[in-house]
């Protein structure tokens, strides 16, 4: 018996000790399959002539990714009992080839359609800092597998913030890559014009390595002493209506970056707030196209909050959609123009600290929209972005900083994160 199998067994034991919480984190947890995959990883690592980048790492899988022999349910009763996938999706195949072990299928907001993580079918877990606070969504279960030390990496997806929001709440690193850099093959969609696969991890280097494997790309080394980072700081949109804790954290981050010699420049991104409804229109319309034939069934077996969000598309005309797609194209161009003189931009990942589950259940529409606000601006603009923790002391929930760039400038984001992260932790 090798080290990878031993590690998998120890993690399985941890899951078994969670009691009822495990059912809120995982939609499926097949111990025998995990051990078979661990045995295969052990053999793959032993036979490889070179070191595998994810050798022996346990990777939880959001229940949107196809795995051979398993039904992908999107954490919905609607999809339970449907035929199992006949093969692994491309991302799963890549992480296995890199030496990783898939470690359970994780719960999410139904169909990945919320930023708060509520799920009436599996229950909603609290976050790692507050058992009564929301976990963030939609990659709620995945975030907790990493935050609780069950897995090294969680595979998530991000349509409006579903990697970055739970990462921010649970003190993790969550990366939303450029959409066209990631394969969506075999990943159950919500809105294909916005969906992006992405990793969550407990440290920056692990998140970067996971991204490299998932995308089939390698972050190039930086030669010599790098120049100061040219950083855009939003004058509007991302920094309006912040709660006091978030405002104080962001001001402190900006001071640290300025003191370290980086060049902070105010940029006007107010057009993102002015066009935020485009996200609501297009995601609802694309989700409606996928699920409208099942609306009758979802009236009895679905989450009514999710169904209501999809049914917003019933109010839209073809002209509304044509206009929204055209405006999004304009917004992407405007974002590129606004970012022309900077390397990256920064903002708080979230405008507020995590509310209580009960508060969100009582005021879902407002709080879900608020939690999605900053992250979804960057889906609207088709950007790439990472959320990294802003430490706040032992036992205190950290804040979170988002670092972003225009589509295709992932390496700029990750290089900036490598330089900014130590400043925040120092």
List where the protein language model places each region:
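Structural helix-boundary/capping segments
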Residues: 5-6, 17, 147-239, 251-260, ...
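Flexible, acidic loop-helix segments that line cofactor/substrate-binding pockets
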Residues: 25-28, 227-237, 267-280, 303-316
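Short, surface-exposed loop/helix-turn segments at secondary-structure junctions
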Residues: 76-78, 278, 322-323, 353-372
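Short helix-loop capping/hinge segments that flank enzyme active sites or metal/cofactor-binding pockets
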Residues: 54-74, 228-230, 282-332, 336, ...
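Short glycine-rich anion-binding loops that position phosphate/pyrophosphate groups of nucleotides
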Residues: 64, 350-353
